[in-house]
Amino acid sequence: MNVLPCSINTLKGLYDISGVEVGQHLYWQIGGFQVHGQVLITSWVVIAILLGSVTIAVRNPQTIPTNSQNFFEYVLEFIRDLSKTQIGEDYGPWVPFIGTMFLFIFVSNWSGALFPWKIIQLPHGELAAPTNDINTTVALALPTSVAYFYAGLTKKGLGYFSKYIQPTPILLPINVLEDFTKPLSLSFRLFGNILADELVVVVLVSLVPSVVPIPVMFLGLFTSGIQALIFATLAAAYIGESMEGHH
């Protein structure tokens, strides 16, 4: 007889959890703009971690690299290889951009699973991975869109726009739409995957003993890394495509 009330209470609990995760925000008024305060806080933490780690690792570069220097050299080599594969021989100027995107997204995604954000109480909302907020993922996707337009115009001048009528002018609307949907697909893919991962872990922790969600958390770490790689790879591929002029 108590099954139905219990089920209703369980569903209500899940609804409350999801409401906290995606519906409440700490708003800051900066000038005439209203921003999500918790996103800025966690983003600053991620940036501080990245800058601090790099500064400590390479402040005293050695001819024979230490462990930390070795690690960052490996990361740089990985990003250079990724950029060269997707962009081509003119990849050099784009390595800092692709590397910044990859590292920020990677650390942001992992921070959602590894950092004890929940113990920090806010007046409204709660701290989570920066990429758990659609504003962050859109802010990452828009510079990518600007970057591939800039790359194409720099390489080809106004002739870049001729690609919209290739192979036939009848495809003009579709080709234009394709370029403007790229940032949407980048931002929503990253946001959806990170949000879903965090919600799944929160729901499992609330329903079952804490040891059970651990495999899901490890899977989330793997997925978070893959999402950072996908974003960086697609960003580099879009830049390379705009410079080469083929789809």
Swiss-Prot record:
Molecular function as annotated in GO: proton-transporting ATP synthase activity, rotational mechanism
Compartmental location: Plastid, Chloroplast thylakoid membrane
Keyword annotations of the record: ATP synthesis, CF(0), Chloroplast, Hydrogen ion transport, Ion transport, Membrane, Plastid, Thylakoid, Transmembrane, Transmembrane helix, Transport
Pfam entry (one): ATP-synt_A
Entry function: Key component of the proton channel; it plays a direct role in the translocation of protons across the membrane.
Membrane topology (UniProt): Multi-pass membrane protein
GO CC terms: chloroplast thylakoid membrane; plasma membrane; proton-transporting ATP synthase complex
Regions crossing the membrane: 38-58, 95-115, 134-154, 199-219, 220-240
Protein name as it appears in the record: ATP synthase subunit a, chloroplastic
Family, per entry: Belongs to the ATPase A chain family.
SUPFAM superfamilies per record: F1F0 ATP synthase subunit A
PANTHER family for this protein: ATP SYNTHASE SUBUNIT A, CHLOROPLASTIC
Organism taxonomic ancestry: Eukaryota, Viridiplantae, Streptophyta, Embryophyta, Tracheophyta
Subunit structure: F-type ATPases have 2 components, CF(1) - the catalytic core - and CF(0) - the membrane proton channel. CF(1) has five subunits: alpha(3), beta(3), gamma(1), delta(1), epsilon(1). CF(0) has four main subunits: a, b, b' and c.
